[in-house]
Amino acid sequence: MVVCNGHHWEPKYPNYPGKFSGSFLHSHQYKKAAPFADKKVLVIGGGNSACDVAVESSRVSSKTALSWRRGYRIIPKFLMGKPTDVFATKMSFMPIFLRNLVAGLIANINNGSNKIYGLPKPDQKFGATHPTINSELLYKIRHGKIKPKVEIDRFDGKKVFFKDNTNEEFDVIIACTGFALAHPFFDESFLNYREGPVPLYLKMFHPKYDNLFFIGMFQPLGCILPGAEQQSKLLSLALKKIWKRPSNIESLCEREVSHPHMKQINTNRHRITVDFHRFMKDLKSQIKKAV
């Protein structure tokens, strides 16, 4: 069995006291900003989806606010005239800690402090969370198109109360609060990656079952498709018995869990994060050894 169901399809919804009487949806349901024209919109979250949705909705809404429960670092889409991923590729020869140090320094110089924009200070080191890449959010905040808000405390009708003792009315709330690592076709007693580690060798080979494989069960700092392509190539070699499962695959899985590419916070998304360049190198190395 080859599992390719992805990890961005089962929405995770936040839970707050009270009941919101307006429209409440997840970013998974968001298609375009047009339906929110002339409405008061509150976006929850600080990741890429949240910031993109906030920017897009602010173009048509009567009001857009963005609620963060913690601080995030915003990375511009372009650094020194180059797309950020191109810039990151040029630094791929560096150790990950040094890359994070350099990228964080450049981002801080480019953006300044979050405090300038009314945003909370990041509570993690650069690289401890997935980067939020957006070149319009801070511009929109400084021009009054997006209003930063702290964490939500509770709902009462269309009124939203925040933890700084302020409250405002909204017509629409869009929760950009991530997704679960869900495999509903498996009994949870057999396999459950919703919580806890994901012990898969190269994020694809199960340590116990040699006929169960996963493609795309990783979160790269970059595009997922090249990595999924290399996994597919390695899978084809495994199915043809050209690539042999390591005899110590269980210990290799344990090592991947205990020694991740990057030390990040313990959430579903970050438990499957890989360093794009290192991950590609590891997969290509296994393919080369087999052929």
Predicted feature descriptions by range:
Residues 1-73, 77-78, 92-248, 263-291:
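Flavin (primarily FAD) cofactor-binding/catalytic cores of flavoenzymes
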Residues 80-82:
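Short low-complexity, flexible loop/linker segments enriched in glycine and/or proline
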Residues 88-89:
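Basic, ligand-binding patches in group-transfer machinery
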Residues 249-253:
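Charge-dense, low-complexity polyampholytic segments
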